[in-house]
């Protein structure tokens, strides 16, 4: 396929994928796993990026939704809980008072507010050890001192 044809196909597919993402977001907000699966998997397969832009997930419980390869841009996830998976990307989002207790996640975050994060001894943001460890990264994010200390002790990259 030529580069031009590929570009045209991407332009044609983008609105379809965004409609699917809007329906996926609505299913998550409704805590409706069957609708989530019906809307997601024909359009976006496991291992492919699920991109949410300008969505409000305030107070949502993500417990039954595997979040690997989720991308949140300009989203509100304040007071959400059971966020887990790898990798999860956050850009310019509010993720205040999120409950990560018991979570195991690799997070790539930039320009986000993570103040008030809840965590416990089981919370993991780094897998493995040494040079081969998969580490979460918080770049230019707002963190309270306690959270910053917790993440640093785990070996999370904070800039």
Predicted regions and their residues:
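Generic alpha-helix initiation/capping and coil-helix boundary signal
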Residues: 13, 19-20
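Acidic, Ala/Val/Gly-enriched low-complexity intrinsically disordered segments
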Residues: 3-5
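Short, positively charged and aromatic/hydrophobic N-terminal segments
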Residues: 7, 12-14
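Tandem repeat scaffolds
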Residues: 22-25, 29-159
């Amino acid at each position: 396929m030529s580069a031009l044809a590929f570009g045209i196909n991407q332009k044609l597919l983008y609105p379809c994928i965004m409609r699917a993402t809007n329906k996926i977001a609505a299913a998550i907000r409704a805590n409706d796993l069957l609708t989530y699966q019906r809307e997601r998997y024909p359009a976006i397969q496991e291992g492919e990026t699920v991109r949410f832009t300008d969505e409000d997930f305030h107070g949502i419980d993500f417990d039954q939704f595997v979040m690997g390869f989720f991308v949140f841009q300009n989203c509100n996830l304040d007071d959400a809980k059971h966020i887990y998976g790898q990798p999860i990307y956050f850009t310019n989002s509010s993720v205040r008072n999120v409950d990560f207790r018991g979570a195991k996640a690799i997070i790539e975050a930039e320009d986000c507010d993570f103040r008030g994060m809840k965590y416990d001894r089981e919370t993991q943001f780094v897998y493995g050890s040494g040079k081969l460890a998969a580490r979460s990264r918080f770049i230019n994010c707002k963190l309270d001192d306690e959270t910053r200390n917790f993440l640093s002790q785990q070996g999370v990259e904070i800039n």
